Curated annotation (Swiss-Prot):
Residues bound to Mg(2+): D287, D364, E366
Location of the protein in the cell: Cytoplasm
Annotated protein name in UniProt: Cytosol aminopeptidase
Membership in a protein family: Belongs to the peptidase M17 family.
Residues engaged in binding Zn(2+) 2: K282, D287, D305, E366
A GO molecular-function descriptor: peptidase activity
Record: active site: K294, R368
Residues with N6-succinyllysine modification: K45, K61, K103, K221, K455, K476, K489
Cofactor(s) this protein requires: Zn(2+); Mn(2+)
Enzyme class: hydrolase
Keyword Glycoprotein: no
Residue(s) carrying Phosphoserine: S54, S180, S194, S238
Organism, scientific name: Mus musculus
Top-level taxon in the UniProt lineage: Eukaryota
Length: 519
């Protein structure tokens, strides 16, 4: 145990407020390693007082109303997502952070397409936990704030930071549920957030560390520790050649790093022969653009061009931990896209697994080339659903930015399921057009059956989706273009700056709901 010195200014403030702190009383037995995050709602009416949550009200009574007294005279009412820290109120919690939750009545917002109350909890709890981390306290108890799952997600997502390769690291903070609330919901939230953090870790890691082989090994380790109902196949280049995945191989051949086709199985259904859901993820572990090389500015971000593979694999790991009663298969073609004497050249023609030929007019449109073969292979499992995720186009970022994942699908039923899941998680999706209008722009090709570029500069995300559709015959397929949500600057308050791991939680929620519908 160590003693955290109370800041001098805070000690003066406490004395002026008439609160004799633990430091004044000399209680050496106090637990100085633990913080507490409590929620308070905004006023519903102008003449109302802001109301504590149940946990907040209980703590206020425990300290004889001092928390309310200090809060009232320390500044204006807390707005949603804002925090205020108090010291020395109780020997078990030397630091108490009160967080603004917004209005208690906040629910699903049909314009924002999310549950505002849940989002407020995630943002507020994340801010409170970071305050505790800044105080270098290794433990924090968190008020469930009326939704223990959302609170857990805010805590675990908000505290995560990739510092694996730094000598100086932030204090690791262990977040626990405060009181005897809904522990099951809290643990579910921890699981959802941990799944997203796994994707963030994979995406943030530098490309010289996170090679195709290393990526596959990490997923294998995580999946096998999640459940015994799993199988992992790390397919080498020779297997890819046997499968005649010429489109995938054409991208991989430019790099000295060997390609890997990762195939993971979670067999949760009591019926071993039940048709699976198949998730497919783009796995470019570094994208230089190839011969059609990218500008050097921000090229380092292309270490996360395997975000599709990271999110779908992390979602399946989470589904295995949840022990969902369904069968799921994950497919991830993994390679680098590099320029060399062996690399694809503009104008080359390659052949996909289904026999279709592809004219490669731009080697930086490589994600669709590797997905084409993976989508063809996905059909061999006779799946119920095929969903692929990919950081596919800069055009998607231009269209939606970081507000939502773009979804292109041939199934309104599948769209509705994904949308409903996203409202729950706050990691939103938005339906994009899959018109024949765009298909004509990719099949009008001089040398081959299909071109990896659209005929015109405009609607790049739509023509990329139309290209993928040429390799899909399944009637329940969705393509998630996650290029716009790949990173977070300051848009999502409960995620730190860096790779976002989105939309992992939405995929987990989709799987959870699908499993309930199936049963």
């Amino acid at each position: 145990m160590y003693l955290l010195p109370l800041p001098a200014a805070a000690r003066v403030a406490l004395r002026r407020l008439g609160v004799r702190g633990l430091w004044d009383r000399g209680l050496s037995t106090a637990d100085m390693t633990k913080g507490l995050v409590l929620g308070i709602y905004a006023k519903d009416k102008d003449d109302d007082l802001p109301q504590f949550t149940s946990a907040g009200e209980s703590f206020n009574k425990l300290v004889s109303g001092k928390l309310r007294e200090m809060l009232n005279i320390s500044g204006p009412p807390l707005k949603a997502g804002k925090t205020r820290t108090f010291y020395g109120l109780h020997q078990d919690f030397p630091s108490v952070v009160v967080v603004g939750l917004g209005k208690r009545s906040a629910g699903v917002d049909d314009q924002e397409n999310w549950h505002e109350g849940k989002e407020n909890i995630r943002a507020a709890v994340a801010a409170g936990c970071r305050q505790v981390q800044d105080l270098e306290l290794p433990s924090v108890e968190v008020d469930p704030c009326g939704d223990a799952q959302a609170a857990a997600e805010g805590a675990v997502l908000g505290l995560y930071e990739y510092d694996d390769l730094k000598q100086k690291k932030k204090v690791a903070v262990s977040a626990k549920l405060h009181g005897s609330g809904d522990l099951e919901a809290w643990e579910k939230g921890v699981l959802f957030a941990s799944g997203q953090n796994l994707a963030r870790h994979l995406m943030e890691s530098p490309a010289n560390e996170m090679t195709p082989t290393r990526f596959a090994e990490i997923i294998e380790k995580n999946l096998k520790s999640a459940s015994s109902k799993t199988k992992v196949h790390i397919r080498p280049k020779s297997w890819i050649e046997e499968q005649e995945m010429g489109s995938f191989l054409s991208v991989a051949k430019g790099s000295e790093e060997p390609p890997v086709f990762l195939e993971i199985h979670y067999m949760g259904s009591p019926n071993a022969t039940e048709a699976p859901l198949v998730f497919v993820g783009k796995g470019i572990t570094f994208d230089s653009g190839g011969i059609s090389i990218k500008a050097s500015a921000n090229m380092d971000l292309m270490r996360a061009d395997m975000g599709g593979a990271a999110t779908i694999c992390s979602a399946i790991v989470s589904a295995a931990k949840l022990n969902l009663p369904i069968n799921i298969i994950g497919l991830a073609p993994l390679c680098e896209n590099m320029p060399s004497g062996k690399a694809n050249k503009p104008g080359d023609v390659v052949r996909a697994r289904n026999g279709k030929t592809i004219q490669v007019d731009n080697t930086d449109a490589e994600g669709r080339l590797i997905l084409a073969d993976a989508l063809c292979y996905a059909h061999t499992f006779n799946p119920k659903v095929i969903i692929n995720a990919a950081t596919l186009t800069g055009a998607m970022d231009v269209a939606l930015g970081s507000g939502a994942t773009g979804v292109f699908t041939n199934s309104s039923w599948l769209w509705n399921k994904l949308f409903e899941a996203s409202v729950e998680t706050g990691d939103r999706v938005w339906r994009m057009p899959l018109f024949e209008h765009y298909t004509r722009q990719v099949i009008d090709c001089q040398l081959a059956d299909v071109n990896n570029l659209g005929k015109y500069r405009s609607a790049g995300a739509c023509t990329a989706a139309a290209f993928l559709r040429e390799f899909v015959t399944h009637t329940k397929w969705a393509h998630l273009d996650i290029a716009g949500v790949m990173t977070n600057k300051d848009e999502i308050p409960y995620l730190r700056k860096g790779m976002s791991g989105r939309p992992t939680r939405t995929l987990i929620e989709f799987l959870l709901r699908f499993s309930k519908d199936s049963s």
